[in-house]
A protein has these predicted regions:
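AMP-forming adenylation/ATP pyrophosphatase catalytic core
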Residues: 1-137
Length: 137
């Protein structure tokens, strides 16, 4: 079986409404305020990131060795390598999965949602929802 070769990537972007393109797809970024929380589907909140916890600049990139993710649903922290293994994602495809980071911290991973450290809470004033629009170009 032949696998396509995928290369690591990193794209920096400002936090604002719009589309962020990276080599293997796109991310849709939408900004909301506290009053929008009641009107959103609970599933979307798995991809909601508190703006006060991230700053104005983020990166979308491929995973790096040692990246960790704190799952709010599972209440634990694991390396992305372990998460991808458990999800049975083929190794060559793992580099394509977008990881949004703030500095060295993992904020959001497609298919896994927002890290517990960056999720919205009762003090949230503004937040973004990240939606993966992946697909090979």
């Amino acid at each position: 079986m032949l696998f396509r070769s995928y290369l690591p990537f990193s794209v920096t972007f400002n936090v604002k409404d719009g589309i962020v393109e990276y080599p293997y797809g796109k991310l849709k970024i939408q900004i909301f305020t506290q009053k929008d929380l009641q009107n959103l589907n609970k599933v979307l909140l798995d991809n909601a990131v508190d703006c006060d916890k991230i700053g104005n600049v983020l990166s979308v990139r491929s995973r790096k060795e040692g990246d960790k993710f704190s799952s709010a649903r599972r209440k634990n922290t694991k390396t992305l390598k372990k998460l991808f293994n458990e999800a049975k994602i083929p190794q060559p495809k793992r580099v394509c999965i977008p990881v949004v980071s703030s500095g060295e911290k993992t904020v959001w991973v497609e298919g896994f949602g927002t890290s517990s450290e960056f999720r919205v809470d009762k003090c949230t004033r503004r937040f973004i929802i990240i939606t993966g629009l992946t697909g090979e170009n």
